[in-house]
Amino acid sequence: MKKFKALLPIFIFWASIFAQDQFNNEFDYSQIIKVPDLSFVNQVYTGLDILEQMDFRILENKTIGVLCNQTAVNRNGRHLLELIGTHSNIEVAAIFEPEFGLWGIDDKRTKLIGNDRIDPVTGAKIYSLIERSVYPPDWIMSELDIVLIDIQDTGVRYSTYIPSITKFLESASDHEVSVILLDRPNPLGGLKIEGPLPRTEYQSYEAYHLLPIRHGLTIAEIIIMVNEMGWVKDLKRANLMIVPMANWTRDQYFDDTKLPWKKPAPYINDLHTLLMFSGLDLFRGTNINVGFGTDHPYLWFGSPWLAAGYFSEKLDRLKLPGVEFKEVTYRPVGSPYYNRVPQYDGRSCSGLEIIITDQDLVKPVETATTIITLMNQLHPREFQWRGHDYIDKLFGSDMLRVFVAQKKPPSYLSPQWMHDEMKFSEFRKSFLLYN
């Protein structure tokens, strides 16, 4: 960090040059804030790091709202709200929190004053975009000049952060409020794409936009796509500005960036958990326990009726890339991640541990659909879909459920979404900010 601090005068010099024409007009409705070339510094800097080095000048004398959570930290682990709180000429009038809250489900640092939750650093009231309404209140939006957004996305379509930001763009458009989004890495890298595109009739918060399950985009690249393509309701566009990262490349996973890891969701403990989440979150649409009620969500799965030894032998014969399986016996007890009881709570489960042997080769969606297909074939009476075909919303179509019913070999399924992957890979090119 000392090397980068030494660059601060140079950075401000260039920032002042760009002050007259600081935006890239490559897009019709979205602007990229220009920052100096820092390629000679061998470190990744998030949009927050860049904004901090600009001394938050674009926010001076503005009334702002902030949409963020616990992941909005700089390279040194300091939170966005803490950093802004040191600037008396920036007024934070409202804080908006996505799913799982501002600080995560276990953190109680917000103050309760009457019925209002207050951030102790900025003194701003906190509004949830999940619990009562998916939109921010109209009366507070009418008071804002800018909404600042900083959230570490998962890189996986199931997450609700992108839908929440999309709803925010709609409200910002209605109230003519500018949106500044600070970019962060896709923790799963920017090269791999896996899974089908959702069909329109199956779109939901888990499949909100036309993205593969693993999309390989940063949060800014997705939101630019949403804004440019008119994917906001009624083709609304926001005055969107992006503070990009410096020195992130698409071949980098999160552990390559040397940035501090903050769980993007309370059940995602590390990068390997996140990798398997991109496939095994489909198990929420089945009666298979996916490690909830244990310390190994998405890396363990099982049930009281699974013949784990025989099932492991069948999986090993399929030679799924980048993974190995090991038998485990466990008893799920409660869950710190949701206010709900995990499947088979308190019951002994036979299961398998997923061991990632090569994160560059593993295909989590193919792994998950193979397990589901094989589970149905080996345990046709015990295996069940849950929640009125909830699996269709997670998957984005009824393709998986229909395929499982047809009893075809598991390896026949993934080629069916290969065309979607190729089509999306070509489509996304014009929205990529990084090489």
Protein language model annotation of sequence segments:
Residues 153-165:
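Glycine/threonine-rich flexible loop motifs
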Residues 91-101, 182:
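Short internal beta-strands
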Residues 1-30:
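Bacterial Sec-dependent N-terminal signal peptides
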Residues 203-277:
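Conserved anion/nucleotide-ligand pocket segment
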Residues 248-333:
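Glycine-rich, aromatic-lined ligand/substrate-binding cores of catalytic
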Residues 104-108, 180-202:
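Glycine-rich, charge-decorated loop segments at or immediately adjacent to ligand/cofactor-binding or catalytic sites
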Residues 112-144, 156:
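Glycine-rich oxoanion-binding loops at beta->alpha junctions
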Residues 302-415:
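Conserved functional hotspot residues or short segments at active or partner-binding sites
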